[in-house]
Amino acid sequence: DNLELTSKYDLNVGKHRMNALVGYSYQYYTYERFYANNYNFPTDFYQWHNLGLGQALKDGKAGMGSDKNENTLIGFFARVSYAFDNKYNLLVSVRQEGSSKFGDNNKWGTFPSASLGWTISNEGFMEGITWLNNLKLRAGFGITGVIPNDPYMSLTRYNYGSSYYYDKGTWKPGLEVASNPNPDLKWEKSTEYNIGLDFSVLNDRLGGSVDIYRKKTTGLLFNYSVPTPPNLYSYTFANGGSVRNQGIEVAINAIPVQTKDFEWKTVVTVAHNASKLLSLSNDMYESNSYMDTGGLGEPISVSTHRMEEGRPLGEFYGLKSVGVSENGLFLIE
């Protein structure tokens, strides 16, 4: 279910243009699933339309399951933009969002953003430069948030596991703790600063943009190993580490050939990003300085990547093979 209400205001006076927007949004998500499997069918003719025909159901080996989850996201937002004389632009916005996925102490997050623009080519001192069609300088700032996929990671959850208890002559399955509560679970936030330049020349036959950015993500959502006791489960989902990304993006647009019946457009983009894992831990939750991820199947069966503090993300990490022995075994350096 979705609901969004907005109210807009516009004002134009001389060379001044301003518009404002305020709004409210409500989003309710529910997910339901049912699944079943069977095998050893006497024929494939029915496909999935006659699941009960398979022999596995008669043997008590067929599978079946179902689940359901739900979550709510509420937001209040406002945006104001101002422009003067087609030269100077200002945009300011803020969004306050609350999600049922977070802990009781931190369900709400505030996400502001702002940007400035200066269209230099519209200035009076640029009038004599006829080959320049557009030149604009931009700068911006913004904070964004990330919500966990699982809607119940801040709560104590229970599953029927491998533990049983004896009751009136019958062994019955017991409930086991499946997650520790975390009332302080909060938004993973990214703060980004950027500065950019747009340009076009020669009647817009050649143009492009250059953007330089720096982004820092804090409160990374992560499963931390915790002692039991005092915890009832060996992992707690919490906010911990931080990552930094910075780089440059360049785009060039060109129209080498342009006639009445034919136009050739070329777009070239170049980007460089440098990432660095600053930490995997914080004052409350500690982890190793690295974590192995990814993996290969047989016959290697090892991780392929390592996330390590002080190192870039996405690095391959593993054993280095230098050949194969006479017996067909891998030789490792």
Residue spans for each PLM region:
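Short, intrinsically disordered, charge-balanced linker/junction segments flanking boundaries
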Residues: 325-333
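C-terminal segments of large proteins
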Residues: 311-325
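Extracellular/periplasmic, surface-exposed regions of secreted and cell-surface proteins
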Residues: 1-311
